[in-house]
Amino acid sequence: MSKRESAKHKIDRRLGENIWGRPKSPVNRREYGPGQHGQRRKGKLSDFGVQLRAKQKLKGFYGDISEKQFRKTYEEAARRKGDTGENLIGLLESRLDAVVYRAKFVPTIFAARQFINHGHVNVNGRRVNIQSYRLKVGDVVEVREKSKQLAIVLEAVQLAERDVPDYIDVDHNKMVATYNRVPGLSDVPYAVQMEPNLVVEFYSR
């Protein structure tokens, strides 16, 4: 099992949910967490526990980004006008790694981060190797020419388990995606329920 596959399985088991909707998720086979004590019945979570779980789930979905980076994103969402939870989703979905994943250029969010790190992606014609790079509406993301025939790319395009959301236009023949608009929670095709309002409550304590 690769390190990326192990990380995905660990997050799913820890949360007890198949947060990416993957057929091979370990939680499809069992209903308890990792470790020798994973089979013990879980008690009812406190309000804090529910809020913490919501944060862990959202943070985990985007590749288990660091607490420092996630909190920084939340604080930016809180400073903006409008609903903080909706702003948070919009900021997370405008990350370059999220758009590369949503566009089906790679099979997983973890693969997206590595793909970007290795210099396989251009934004508006220039190479960008920063996972958290913030896209603006109208930005064009393209797989670099020499990378278009990589097995990981060809495999991802064929994945039937997820569709490209309508806030991203994709041409898989050219391997080009345009970020059309900032989505709200209802626009994002999460495989499980995400509750950014609980994340706001967590950080507002």
Curated annotation (Swiss-Prot):
Q: Where is this region: Disordered?
A: 1-46
Q: Which domain of life is it from?
A: Bacteria
Record's compositionally biased regions (Basic and acidic residues): 1-16
HAMAP family given for it? Answer: Ribosomal_uS4_B
The record's annotation in PROSITE patterns points to: RIBOSOMAL_S4, S4
Q: What does this protein's UniProt record list under function? A: One of the primary rRNA binding proteins, it binds directly to 16S rRNA where it nucleates assembly of the body of the 30S subunit. With S5 and S12 plays an important role in translational accuracy.
Q: Which SUPFAM superfamilies match?
A: Alpha-L RNA-binding motif
**GO cellular component annotations of the record:** small ribosomal subunit
List the Pfam families hit by this protein, alphabetically: Ribosomal_S4, S4
This protein is called what?
Small ribosomal subunit protein uS4
The subunit structure is:
Part of the 30S ribosomal subunit. Contacts protein S5. The interaction surface between S4 and S5 is involved in control of translational fidelity.
* Species whose genome carries this gene: Brucella abortus (strain 2308)
> rRNA-binding among the record's keywords?
yes
An example GO biological process term is: ribosomal small subunit biogenesis
The entry's family comment says: Belongs to the universal ribosomal protein uS4 family.
> Which UniProt key words apply to this protein?
Ribonucleoprotein, Ribosomal protein, RNA-binding, rRNA-binding
On whether Nuclease is a keyword of this UniProt record, the answer is no
Under InterPro entries, the record lists: Ribosomal_uS4, Ribosomal_uS4_bac-type, Ribosomal_uS4_CS, Ribosomal_uS4_N, S4_RNA-bd, S4_RNA-bd_sf
Q: Where is the signal peptide?
A: none
Q: Which positions fall inside the S4 RNA-binding domain?
A: 94-157
Molecular function terms from GO: rRNA binding; structural constituent of ribosome
Organism lineage: Bacteria, Pseudomonadati, Pseudomonadota, Alphaproteobacteria, Hyphomicrobiales
